[in-house]
Amino acid sequence: DMPKIPDLDFDFEVKRSARRKTLCLQIRDGHVQVVVPTRTPDRQINALVKKHKDWVNKKLGEQLARPKAAPKAYVAGERFGYLGAEHRLKIVEGAHWPLERVGQELVVTLPARLQGAARCSKVKERLHEWYLLAALEQFQERTDIYSRRLGVTPTLVQVKSYKRRWGSCSTGGEISYNWRLVIGPAEVMDYVVAHEVSHMLEHNHSPAFWRIVEDLMPNYREQQAWLNKFGGMLAI
C-alpha cells in the first residue's frame, strides 16, 4: 500500500492499524513509514507526507552525509575503493581503452594528447562506466545467491544512481541497487541484497520482515550500522 506522489524523491510505506488513532510519520534505517488508522484515505496520507517532505529529505540526507568522501582530482596515484579495498589509479598513455582492474590498480588508458581538465573528465567518465558494470555484475551474482535461499526469483536486477536510498524492490519483483555500494565492504552489499530480496516475501518492514533478513544474515545489524555511519564515504 504505497500511494504515489509526483515529484517526491523518496518512497514511503503505509501501515494501516485498527489500533492507531492518529497519523504518524517515522523514519527507520533509511525507510519512511506512515502509520495510520485503518480507514484513513490516501489523500490525507499524501497531505501529511507533502507537508513534512522537507523534514524527511533532511533526515534521509543526514544518513547519507556522514562522513563525506573527500573530492577526487582524478589523477594518477589517487585511491578508489572497490569491495572495501583501496585501489590505486594508474593512467597509461595509448589508444582509448576501457578501464581495467589489475591487482590493486585501476588502469585507465588515454591518448597522450588528452591533458588537463579534459583528461580528468575522461578519467572520471571511465571510472563511472567501470563501477556501474562492476556493481551490476556483483549485485546480479549476490542477488541470485540470496534469492535461491529464499526460493524467490526477481524479475529484474539493476543498478541506479540513487541519492537517498541504497536499494528498492517493487511489488513486481524488480530489484534496484545503488551502484555506489560496490565501493564499500562486500558484507555491506550482502546486507542490502538480503534486505531487498526479503521484500519479495514481506513488502514492508514488519517484525516478520526483519526475521527473514536476520535468517539470511544473522549479523545484519553490524552492516546496517556501518552503512548508516559511513554511507557518505561511498563516492568516486
List each model region and its residues.
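Active-site-proximal or metal-binding-adjacent scaffold patches in catalytic folds
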Residues: D1-D190, M200-I236
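Walker B catalytic acidic pair
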Residues: E196
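Walker B beta-strand of ABC/ABC-like P-loop ATPase nucleotide-binding domains
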Residues: V193
